[in-house]
A protein has these predicted regions:
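Charged, low-complexity, helix-prone segments enriched in Lys/Glu/Asp/Gln
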Residues: 1-16, 117, 121-133, 159, ...
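Acidic/histidine-rich catalytic cores and adjacent linkers
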Residues: 35, 76, 83, 87-95, ...
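Short alpha-helix boundary/capping motifs
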Residues: 69, 125-129, 145, 299-302
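Conserved beta-strand -> loop -> alpha-helix junction used to position metal-binding or nucleic-acid-contacting
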Residues: 84-141
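RNase H-like nuclease fold core
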Residues: 1-103, 123, 266
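Juxtamembrane helix-loop transition sites at the ends of transmembrane segments
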Residues: 50, 64, 131-136, 289, ...
Length: 323
């Protein structure tokens, strides 16, 4: 089946079959491809793309609202309800979602929020390294001859080693789970630098915010205490302003709904597959070609289970024939 026929089927039989098993939870995202933009909606529990639209310009609120209203109309025709929607931290979505779906729970992708926070923590660690390197004494040329010069040389070497260790093991400040050996390494490289140990403690508290065992209200109370702690952390607190972003509260919405996914991995996976397809399948990138290729990809994914069953049946038949 060609791309044009695949596009026609996606709007008809494919959507009917996909919505027969609709979970009620979706993920929405935009993919930029040169002058074009692909808007996608994916079932966030079955990981199945439901609909898409290819634009020849960067989307605005009107484009997003029109796209969502088209999908909402498809749900209403089938008497289906949307239970929750997950997006990234883009400003494109909050207003159109409110206009189209009302007060439906809107979850911001946990990974996108944590990514920004880990970048802030790493930036704070880099600031400490720069401050530490600035304390390195200036040495005269040649070998140190006096006792004072030798003492300064030893101090400079210790500082260089400390800065190097902090740079080499900087990932320990943001890694989610540390092994006992990694914790010992972290204690060693942060010896004499209490602000760095506080930095790691802040990151631990950030990860605890997303613990499914607590409710959103409890997580918000934890967040308020954490923000108070950061405000008192005068030395490098200014580099952690991401903790005060309103997106952080929106990323905790999933805690009140066990079925609401905390990430938009479902739609991100489809975007990655599209990027890979571009590199290996075709080079002509026009609006119509992109739309056709995505339709073919959706059709191929729909038939993946049937292909697997056919392959397994053939393998079993060959095995019996060989026996």
């Amino acid at each position: 089946m060609g791309g044009k026929k695949a596009e026609q089927r996606i709007r008809g039989d494919y959507l009917d079959a996909a919505l027969d098993n609709f979970s009620g939870y979706i993920a929405a995202d935009e993919l930029y491809d040169g002058p074009f933009c692909v808007l996608s909606i994916v079932d966030n529990r079955t990981f199945r793309r439901l609909t898409y639209e290819v634009l020849d310009h960067d989307p605005d609120h009107a484009d997003i609202e029109r796209f969502l209203r088209t999908f909402q109309a498809s749900l209403q025709r089938r008497e289906l309800l949307l239970q929750g929607i997950t997006t990234d931290g883009s400003n494109l979505y909050p207003e159109p979602i409110l206009q189209v779906f009302g007060n439906v729970p809107h979850q911001l992708c946990e990974f996108h929020v944590i990514k920004e926070l880990t970048k802030a923590v790493l930036h704070a660690g880099a600031k400490v390294r720069r401050e530490l390197a600035a304390t390195r004494p200036k040495l005269s040329r040649g070998r140190p001859s006096s006792a004072t010069a030798r003492k300064a040389a030893r101090q400079a070497k210790r500082i260089e080693q400390k800065v190097g260790d902090l740079f080499e093991h900087r990932y320990l400040f943001v890694q989610h789970v540390l092994t006992p050996a990694q914790r010992r390494t972290l204690l060693r490289v942060t010896r004499g630098r209490p602000e760095l140990r506080t930095l790691r403690g802040i990151m631990d508290e950030v990860y605890r915010l997303f613990d499914r065992r607590c409710r959103t209200d409890t997580a918000l109370e934890k967040l308020a205490r954490l923000r108070g702690r950061v405000r008192r952390f005068k030395r490098i607190g200014k580099t952690l302003q991401k903790l005060f972003s309103p997106n952080l509260e929106k990323a905790l919405t999933f805690l009140d709904d066990k079925l609401l996914p905390s990430t938009s991995n479902a739609v991100e996976r489809g975007n990655r597959r599209h990027r890979k397809m571009q590199k290996t399948v075709y080079r002509v990138r026009t609006r119509s070609h992109i739309a056709s290729r995505i339709a073919l990809d959706m059709q191929r994914e729909e038939r993946a289970t049937q292909r697997l069953l056919t392959t397994q049946a053939l393998h079993c038949a060959r095995g019996r024939a060989a026996a």
